[in-house]
Amino acid sequence: MRLLYIARKNLLAKPLQTALSTILLAFGVGMVSLMMLSEKQIKDQFERNIKDIDLVLGAKGSPLQLILANVYHIDAPTGNIDYQAAKDVVNNPRTHIESGIPLAYGDNYMSYRIVGTEYSYPEHYGAILKEGELWTNTYDVVVGAEVAEKTGLEIGSTFYSSHGLTDTTDVHRDKTFTVVGIFDRTSSVIDNLLLTGIESVWGVHEGHENADKEITAMLLKKRTPMAVLTLPNYLKDTNMQVALPSIEINRLNQQFGLGADALRAIALLIMTLSFASIFISVFENMHARRYELALMRTMGGSPGKLYKLLLLEGGLLSAAGVLIGLLISRLGLFVLASAVENKFKYDLSDMGLLTVEIKLALAATFVGLLAAALPAFKALRMDISKTLSNE
């Protein structure tokens, strides 16, 4: 305890140098930790939403946009497709498709998408009703847990939809939706949607040419792997295409991976500089206090005790930097989560400590101790008489 007190006092005696070493390490650890937290949550949500969706059938355009719009609901759709033509794709034995889930949308309520679909869609994500029942009549709506929480909708609430996916000004006041059910939280895309029958979406847009025959996309489950090979050829003379979620998301990860790797490299560089700063801090402290250390030796302090003292100073610097870094990462995640929720309606607010973060903290503390151990080792070989005579 006495050594800990002395080590703390020694660090506080040089606040600028101590603060610099701590801040450098904190920012390095904070950046790496923030990337670990955000990547883990984004990956988990992407994998959860893509579960058992082998292919997505939709209008021709960008395959990635087709996936983002209809699986994750974070982009605009590529267009509409004929509902009967989509059902023919599912029912044709040549396509090797086992089943399909239709999605039709184009309206929103308070920027949350209203999606016309079948019961198989919430069943696919294991959605369970918290209150009420599933839709049975046109304009019945079942809302996701996040939608209910953010908008205040409850059983029996009525509202008008707005045209578009984010605009809330072009309101369809001739058709009234009624909330008949609320889903329990699923930690999937269902939480951020309002689900209704396809007929409700068609009814809102009645009068639009072919509105009652079109959907936005069909989520497909293949019967055999041959579907991946046969479908593109089957659709070549139509206005439809299929996209593979796994391939498109891997491509997206590769594109963002370059930026993530660059940020990770910068964070590691900052951490390296912090370890160098710890080395310099302990070395300069030892050099500036060589007379004090020599006196401690003459008063009975063993070389091992001096070594432990200097090592403890490096350990305190490292531990402080790691702890502050973890706090910085949580603050950064809070800001990032707010931005992501406002923009994409996705929740990244899990602040729990990851196993990989514990490993990062231990590794950073160990390297910090190692950086302090090198100059501290020099204290073991101090020439006491020479040091005192020079002073």
Residue ranges and their predicted role:
Residues 36-113, 123, 137, 234:
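Hydrophobic, regular-secondary-structure patches
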Residues 1, 240, 293, 331-346:
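Peri-membrane helix termini and adjoining interfacial loops of integral membrane proteins
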Residues 328, 342-377, 386-391:
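Conserved transmembrane alpha-helices of multi-pass membrane proteins
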Residues 108-119, 127-207:
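Hydrophobic secondary-structure segments that place a key small or acidic residue at a functional site
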Residues 23, 261-281:
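Internal alpha-helical transmembrane segments of multipass membrane proteins
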Residues 1-33, 246, 254, 311:
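N-terminal Sec/SRP start-transfer signal
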Residues 270-273, 283-285, 290-337, 359, ...:
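Transmembrane alpha-helical interface segments in multi-pass membrane proteins
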Residues 92, 171-178, 182-260:
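Mechanotransmission and gating elements of multispan inner-membrane complexes involved in transport
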